[in-house]
Amino acid sequence: MTTPRMLWDISAPVHAGSPVFPGDTPYSQQWCATIGPQCPVNVSALAMSPHVGTHADAPLHYDPQGATIGDVPLDAFIGPCRVIHAIGRGPLVAWEHIAHALGADRPALPQRVLVRTYERMPLDRWDAALAAYAPDTIERLADLGVVLVGIDTASIDPADSKSLDSHQVIRRRGLRVLENLVLDEVPEGDYELIALPLKLTTADASPVRAVLRTPA
């Protein structure tokens, strides 16, 4: 009998108390209709930055001529990936912090790499001291054929960055990015990633419901 494939939900919960980048629009919800004698349904209206919670950035986020998230091909967001632990490493995740999971004695590197930096991701507060990717780390991953990088913090760049150097590497190398992943319970290793963005035709990012499955 086939062993069931284990599933990890690596998405942050989204609600009014979800952390938000300073200046971004937090999550809010208003009820437009509620079930009652004259109404058979509940209907709400949502307002939020598309960067609240676990999300995929579109090229438009860091390139004025970049594609919207609705125009980004989906292939990078589904497929084999490797989760690498760099817990407590920062402010920048350097190559030496992830090299232990990339050695010649390991299986071939999948095209998607997710890095865990938190022991426990802060789901109820903004972390201005978040860990980010060193730009050279992304360059070297791209050289190895990686098409998507992810991290369990709110940005692949430091929170106070004005140049967004790692985002500019993503732009130049044509990579995709996932941010605000929840990797607290996920062991290092290889998985199948499924994290599809919504087809928002004018947006600079999209929420995703990101999950990992053990390989078939």
Swiss-Prot record:
One of its GO terms (molecular function) is arylformamidase activity. Keywords: Hydrolase, Metal-binding, Tryptophan catabolism, Zinc. Its cofactor is Zn(2+). The active site is at H61 (proton donor/acceptor). Pfam families: Cyclase. Zn(2+) 1 binds at H51, H55, D57, E179. Binds 2 zinc ions per subunit. One of its GO terms (biological process) is L-tryptophan catabolic process to kynurenine. Substrate binds at F21. It catalyses: N-formyl-L-kynurenine + H2O = L-kynurenine + formate + H(+). Its EC number is 3.5.1.9. InterPro entries: KFase/CYL, KFase_sf, Kynurenine_formamidase_bac. The keyword Manganese does not apply. Homodimer. HAMAP family: KynB (MF_01969). This is Kynurenine formamidase.
